[in-house]
Every structure is written in structure tokens, then in C-alpha cells.
Amino acid sequence: SDKENIKKTEAALAMVENLDYNVGKVIDSLKKYKLYDNTIIIYFSDNGPNGNRWNNDLKEKKGSTNEGGVRVPFFIQWPKKIKPGIRINQVLSVLDIFPTLIELTDNNSEIDFDGMSFKKYLDNENLINNQRKIFSYWNNKISVRNNRFILDSENNLFDLKLDHRQEYSVNDKFSSDYNELKKAKNIWKNTVVSKY
């Protein structure tokens, strides 16, 4: 595990404090100009942390296709339309944000987006789509996950419900899930990655 670098930790904490302060300023301004109740506020990160600190013991960090490199918190708020305090358990992607905004704002679009709207999950937090697959690619490494499993770049299957640290491969125990995700990964590699 990474040895704690006090200077980097201090810098990271200062950035969090600065971000918190400035998000507060934006919210105060929205309230001041009576725009807050009809403004969608989204907060998330683009990748996991640059060190193994603060990642809930997820495997690896930024620059990895494992959970520690790609799993991030995501907050969305819209006081007039989104019920506060809900927790979505559906695996989502950054690609889902724009289609969701289109649907939330009742706009119609003829564009076929790569992502999907997650508005239905905001309306019903217990809804789950176990067929949904999210692909991650970095430095010729590919992982694919669904709501329960991740198939890492080395083709090891992990049950994230029981093993969020990705320590115990379950390839043999869940061979049908392994085969399904491996097939999906190969198709994605040959149809998407091969274009770039």
C-alpha cells in the first residue's frame, strides 16, 4: 500500500476544502437569484484517487480499469424534481449524464446516445438492470462490469457484492457470468477499441 505522503495529503485536503467553499458560493448565488430550486447540480469525479487513500480499499487507483480507478461517487440534485436522499444501486457511467439531463428537462432528442438515461432509477431507487454492462479502457487494458461482477483486464471475475476489494476470483463458481462478460468484452474490444 502507498506510504502516506503528508504534503500530498495536505494538498488534497486543501483542494477538498476549496471545492466545498466554492460549491457553497455557487449554491448561495443560485439561492440569492432565486434559481436554486430549478437548477440541476451534479457533482462527481472523473476517476478514482491518485493514491490508495480514501478509496474504501478498492483495488488500485487512478489509471486502472479496476474499481479503484473508475468507481467514483456521484451526486445529483434538483430540488423541484429529484427526491432528496435516494441512493441508486444501478451501475452507471459518465455516458449516462447527458441522456438523463435530456429526459429530466423533458427535451426530445433524435440523437442515439452511447449512454442511457437513469431518470427511471431516480424515480425508483430499487430498480435494477442486471443486463447493463459498463466497459472501462486504459492503456490497452479493458474491464467490464455489471451490477454484481467485474471481469478485470486479466480476465479474472470478481463478485463485487461480496468482494469489493477484488481479492478472490470466482471464474469457476460463476462460469456463466464469466463467459457472458468475457464474450461482451471481446465484442467491445473488436467493435469499439479496434476503431481507435
Indicate where each model-derived feature is located.
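Short glycine/proline-rich turn/loop motifs
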Residues: 1-8, 78-81, 164-166
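A long, amphipathic alpha-helix that forms part
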Residues: 1-39
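Histidine-centered active-site microenvironments of extracellular/periplasmic hydrolases
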Residues: 4, 28-81, 93
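Extracytoplasmic/periplasmic, Sec-exported soluble proteins
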Residues: 4-18, 50, 89, 93, ...
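Beta-strand elements within well-structured catalytic alpha/beta cores of enzymes
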Residues: 16, 23, 40-45, 73-75, ...
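Short alpha-helical functional segments enriched in proximate histidine and acidic residues
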Residues: 22-29, 100, 104, 188-191
